[in-house]
């Protein structure tokens, strides 16, 4: 018997395959997959950006969706808020994640 996994669950499993990643939380909403990542120490901003880009590349390729629909962040507030969220809260978090991508 096959189980159908949500895109968020698949993304979570992909992100956990990166050795730098300690924890991850995901959700999907309005066609977007939001990924909040906790890592061990990464001191270089370039390395941090490279890891997020690698995560977006791998998730987009696996899920066969546009990278513009993958929102990845190191934001701790976003990570905490994703613990147990309602649909109304997802709208707010999705908006915050989208704003962070444009920075």
Indicate where each model-derived feature is located:
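Short beta-strand elements
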Residues: 22-26, 66-74
């Amino acid at each position: 018997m096959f189980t159908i996994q949500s895109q968020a669950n698949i993304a979570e499993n992909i992100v956990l395959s990166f050795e730098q990643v300690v924890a991850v939380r995901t959700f999907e909403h309005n066609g977007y997959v939001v990924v909040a990542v906790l890592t061990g120490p990464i001191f270089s901003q370039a390395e941090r950006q490279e890891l997020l880009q690698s995560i977006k590349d791998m998730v987009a390729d696996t899920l066969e969706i546009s990278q513009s629909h993958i929102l990845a962040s190191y934001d701790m507030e976003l990570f905490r808020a994703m613990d147990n969220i309602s649909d109304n809260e997802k709208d707010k978090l999705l908006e915050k994640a989208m704003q962070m991508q444009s920075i």
